[in-house]
Amino acid sequence: MKKVDVKESAVGREMRIRKQWNEQNIFEQSIQNREGAQSFVFYEGPPTANGLPHVGHALGRTIKDVVARYKTMAGYKVLRKAGWDTHGLPVELGVEKQLGISGKHEIEEYGIEPFIKKCKESVFTYEKQWREFTESIGYWVDMDDPYVTLENPYIESVWHILGTIHEKGLLYKGHRVSPYCPSCQTSLSSHEVAQGYKTVKDLSATVKFKVKDSENEYFLGWTTTPWTLPANVALAVHPNMEYVKAKQEGHVYIVAKERVQDVLKENYEVLSVHKGEELLNISYTAPFPMKEVTNGYRVIGADFVTADSGTGLVHIAPAYGEDDYRVVQSEGLSFLHVVDEKGEYTEAVPFLKGKFVKDCDVDIVRYLAKEDLLYHKEKYEHSYPHCWRCDSPLLYYAGESWLIRTTAIKDTFLQNNDTVTWYPDHMKHGRFGKFLENMVDWNISRNRYWGTPLNVWECERCDHQFAPKSIADLRKHSMKETPEDLELHKPYVDEVQVCCEKCGSTMNRTPEVIDVWFDSGSMPFAQYHYPFENKELFEEQFPADVIAEGIDQTRGWFYSLLAVSALYTGKVPYKRVLSLGHVLDEEGQKMSKSKGNALDPVDLVGKFGADALRWALLVDSALWNAKRFSERTVLEAKSKFVDTLVNVYSFYVLYANLDEYNPNETYDVKRTKLDEWVLSRLHSTTKKVRTALDDYQFTNAAREIAALVDEVSNWYVRRSRNRFWESGMNAEKAAAYETLHDVLVTISKLIAPFTPFVAEDVHLNLTGSSVHLEDYPVVNESLLQPKLEAEMDAVLQVVELGRSNRNQHSLKVKQPLAELVLLEHNENDMDWESYRDIVMDELNVKAFHVELDETKYTSYQLKLNFKKAGPKFGKNVNAVNGWLKQLSQDEVQNFVSTERAVYEVAPGEEIVVTTEDVLVEKVAKSGFSNTTNGQYTVMLDTNVTEELLQEGVAREFIRAVQEYRKQLNLPVNLRVDVILDTEEELQQTLTNHKELLEENLLVKQFTFGHLTNEDDELSLGETKVRIKLSTAQ
């Protein structure tokens, strides 16, 4: 075995391992070795390479890698095809910024073809950084043969899906109100909108709509979007709701009966009550009357009107609201549009022409106030949708869009979702299920440039539609010969014209591109260019056994995968979904570059290593919970877990090499109870870890491993050190080497999916082979000893209590104490005699015994809890307090046992005192201190005799010299001669403990003499000792 370089950094170790993986093609071998095995199917959600990775990507990549590595080691064949999401607005916006242009008009002036070329060039801006990040974090995925959404084969598969959907009659062109981003100048789908809600404060207005031909009668309508008022064409009431006419300050207002108090507040008089249906068709004067409205400005009925907020009357602007649009269509009212594609008012609103509508709420309200049409205004906090790409507030516009009739097969969506196992489980019928229940038809088209072109050609004469399902299909119907290298992007496909099979006229492609979420949702099919090739491979790789992404993908990729597959095949595309929580800063705030609280995962790997970052992300909390995260979290993972494991591994290699121990040779071994215990712990942990991993409970698995590593380091190795330090190779020492070797090799396999670099380093050095080509550990039932584990757990509890006891009383473990008494509160069959030496040695006590009668070593003190007893006992509280103080210890003991006592205040007058009225304090026998955990109480004799004090000094001296040896980098097995120069009292103490010193410090000869200032000095409290070490002769 190679010597472990303890000075090598984690980053250095990981770079070395990466180099070895690449040189030996370990990733490729891990897949090839499973050829013919059952497939475990994994889908990679495609990131975009025109932005840099963040900590959330580190979490996602870690989880996906853990799954793939574990399943591979568990015997499955796991293909891992990378992917790139390359279309969409972020790319366009980046190119616009690069070119110094803005908006569709300037793009078209620049030229669609050169703009598309720039988009294609920019999509892999950060590919090199993504590749380096992916490799540095240890995520094994095939980045040399990825699926790329901009490539013709991928787009052709998407066209086949869309063509099939069109063939089924589920793709249609419709006129409806859709969410619209005025900055990007395109509509969005409902699942895109769901990703961008923000809590904002907007100006709301309660508006006076004057009843036509009345003197002073007004309908009151409330709106949170004053900018829509110029497009008002009607007011809606609920036909079955009650409304009142109420007089206030000379005006009569019509408002819902349930809302009158909230709206009018005070000083009003209800004149009459009316059903909503009585108000229908009453005309009013619009605040912004438009001559284009030839049928409108009247009250209509609508079921969506409620009395939950506002006035119970809804202002209707059909161009900017889905409900508004539907009710106006059914009533046959006029339609009014006063906003252009940039979100600015048109000449229809002259005094605001050219202004962005969301900036005009104040102008509108001022106008209303000037015209005496404003009843009330206030800031209103509500959740408002923003563009998930550019962060601009969205508007709702009526216009033409291409839609997929997802609502027609809603039952298929719901049934398919019912077959999926969600982590966490509540997502199935909660966040995701509710979204499916309320879904609307998918707005698939985008009025942009860089994306998969919508493959629908329309006849200019008869409106017939043709949706080619392949390039060959398009060529077959093309009016002219199409280039062999036809690129399936704008403007190239726009140049292809098709002859209408119905009337013989020319058909042109509809100009839109499609929603990028349809691109990524098509990846199970398009990544293999299905159905044009790789049919067997596709069938083997569909559906996915598991997918894992952030919770924000609930209405993104998780939805689009489910939707595309249901529309195309009717089948569900995945069996399990891991919905990962957000990674927040240490204050619980969302990380953001603008806030300055974002952590760069590349920097974290560079500082602490990928293993530490991965472990920190895994062990902190359940993966679906939001987690607070900081550099300190990663540093703690490194020091507590990775470094602890490396220290154990380094210790083993150091001593095994010194003793020339060879794990491949056969030795006479005699296992101790400690060996049997650690092997049982190893295999019971293996059992728990496998169970947790099979159920995707990665945090539980990681915590089990962390507990095991801690116990191996701080209990097994520490308790076994004397065996390793012995000279020669006896049977117990050979057993210690054999056991620790087996433990380390098995742990390296257990942690291989979690921390692949340190796992590889340990396994490679101990066995000569890559851990990632091994099988995952299986439980050896014959090594399980539950009783032994329970006993050792009890010992560990007692030792921990003893240490805590010492800390509370500032008694260092180096200071011997006379006695430890263990009080057992529950009888059990624990054989403490077998563990006597361990407890005494760990807690440095001279005697140890177990006592069942705790009254021998403890007593109780009762103090009245005046806070509770005062109100209960009133004037008698002081008398009760005095009575408590004079109780005998037997009476106190009886009170503690029965939890009640009766105090006779006066003849015939009794008070019942319970443990709720009293503070019960357990007090140790004089000279003893106690610590308890409910199961056990540890009593330590704290009287330190002169003899014990001197031994404590000697042990403290041993510690100081051991540290000094480390500073000198002396070999651990080097025997030395020691010369000391110190005061006479310390000389005598050390002389009295000469054997103890020689045994623990590998000292052949101790002498005392005069040393100069040039010699080194040690500090033992306030005492100084000069020391000189030399190699023993």
Swiss-Prot record:
Catalyzes the attachment of isoleucine to tRNA(Ile). As IleRS can inadvertently accommodate and process structurally similar amino acids such as valine, to avoid such errors it has two additional distinct tRNA(Ile)-dependent editing activities. One activity is designated as 'pretransfer' editing and involves the hydrolysis of activated Val-AMP. The other activity is designated 'posttransfer' editing and involves deacylation of mischarged Val-tRNA(Ile). It is found in: Cytoplasm. Pfam families: Anticodon_1, DUF5915, tRNA-synt_1. It comes from the Bacteria. It comes from Bacillus anthracis. The gene is ileS2. InterPro entries: aa-tRNA-synth_I_CS, aa-tRNA-synth_Ia, Anticodon_Ile_ABEc, Ile-tRNA-ligase, Ile-tRNA-ligase_type2, M/V/L/I-tRNA-synth_anticd-bd, Rossmann-like_a/b/a_fold, tRNAsynth_Ia_anticodon-bd. The keyword Transcription does not apply. ATP binds at residue 593. CDD domains: Anticodon_Ia_Ile_ABEc (cd07961), IleRS_core (cd00818). This is Isoleucine--tRNA ligase 2. A motif ('HIGH' region) lies at residues 47-57.
